[in-house]
From Swiss-Prot:
Biological or metabolic pathway of the protein: Glycolipid biosynthesis; lipid IV(A) biosynthesis; lipid IV(A) from (3R)-3-hydroxytetradecanoyl-[acyl-carrier-protein] and UDP-N-acetyl-alpha-D-glucosamine: step 6/6
Keywords, sorted A to Z: ATP-binding, Kinase, Lipid A biosynthesis, Lipid biosynthesis, Lipid metabolism, Nucleotide-binding, Transferase
Name of protein: Tetraacyldisaccharide 4'-kinase
GO terms classed as biological process: lipid A biosynthetic process; lipopolysaccharide core region biosynthetic process
Lineage of the organism: Bacteria, Pseudomonadati, Pseudomonadota, Gammaproteobacteria, Legionellales
Organism of provenance: Coxiella burnetii (strain CbuK_Q154) (Coxiella burnetii (strain Q154))
SUPFAM superfamilies: P-loop containing nucleoside triphosphate hydrolases
Signal peptide stretch: none
PANTHER family: TETRAACYLDISACCHARIDE 4'-KINASE, TETRAACYLDISACCHARIDE 4'-KINASE, MITOCHONDRIAL-RELATED
This enzyme's EC code(s): 2.7.1.130
Amino acid sequence: MLKAPRFWYQPRSLLGGILSPFSFLYQIIVRIRRGLYAVGLKKISKFPVPIVIVGNITVGGSGKTPFVIWLANELKNRGFRPGVVSRGYGGKANRFLQTVTENSDPLQVGDEAVLLMKKIDCPMVVCRDRGAAVKHLLRNFQCDVVIGDDGLQHYSLGRDLEIALLDDRHLGNGRCLPAGPLREPKSRLNTVDFVVPKQLRPNEIYQLKNPAKKIDFNELKELTVHAVAGIGNPGYFFKQLETLGANVIAHPFRDHYFYRSEDFNFDDDHLIILTEKDAIKCKQFDDERLFCFSVDAVVPDQFQNDFFRLISNIILRKQAQREGI
């Protein structure tokens, strides 16, 4: 079981100070790498449709998966033809290109990819080379906008809009790896098009063995439950259950962990509540104690208005460029 170091989220700490020189070196490497793309010394793949990148500058969960689900479905509802590309973290397919289906194996394409595909109505491709994934989407599906899931630092993929998500821990101590949780300096947020705070709304709790069997949120009050989470920010999940009144016995696992039946060998009959990402990998277990806690992203109205105005304008501009207008 792994979790982010506590000192990452403390303003001052001895270990953070000791690691600061390495953090400074890391920042230099990140800036040089990004600069090589900016001046054209490294190739950037460009495409005839808008590429929307959703990501973050911190290590760990920032609510990307629920947000991408919302964005893909909202684009579809508004008449667009979206597609999604991802690296397929946690699976083997990041070494080769693969189209994701509802029946894809999380071991092959990653747990997040399977969860996304079960909740969106658009094509999705996973591959380490996101540019190749976009080309495959455009060759085989009539997409007019592509969402890049967790590709903020994947500079070889050209982009038209960048959305950075921030979770409840914000930027931690404000330092880059390894002294802090930042993948890039915090000044990177000044260059993205949108910064959206993570906000998740509880949807439902259902039994894995029989999804028709649900638990009302009111039933959680004063109920002792095992909360199991192999996600980037398990503390957020535990806090959600506690806010609903549950007495939580927390079991954090490393992100993208693949469970075994013995992981649930607790010495009691308390319910075991999993995140959606974890539940995807536990449906084979014949255990009536296993329940899934599903959530939805809550997205600010102002962002929605600004984003859809921009994406419509970008599509029109790219169409005009293709037609030589």
